[in-house]
């Protein structure tokens, strides 16, 4: 999992990327391409 400052640009890299908030953190998850995974921090 990558840790990035801004997830907005990462979200546009694949059409199945989802922006999710969990426990006060923002994540990018992708069910079809598992390699697109990131956390904002």
Swiss-Prot record:
The keyword NAD does not apply. GO terms for biological process: translation. Coiled coil: none annotated. InterPro entries: Ribosomal_bL36, Ribosomal_bL36_sp, Ribosomal_L36_bact. One of its GO terms (cellular component) is ribonucleoprotein complex. It holds the Pfam family Ribosomal_L36. It comes from the Bacteria. One of its GO terms (molecular function) is structural constituent of ribosome. Keywords: Ribonucleoprotein, Ribosomal protein. Belongs to the bacterial ribosomal protein bL36 family. This is Large ribosomal subunit protein bL36. It comes from Methylocella silvestris (strain DSM 15510 / CIP 108128 / LMG 27833 / NCIMB 13906 / BL2). The gene is rpmJ.
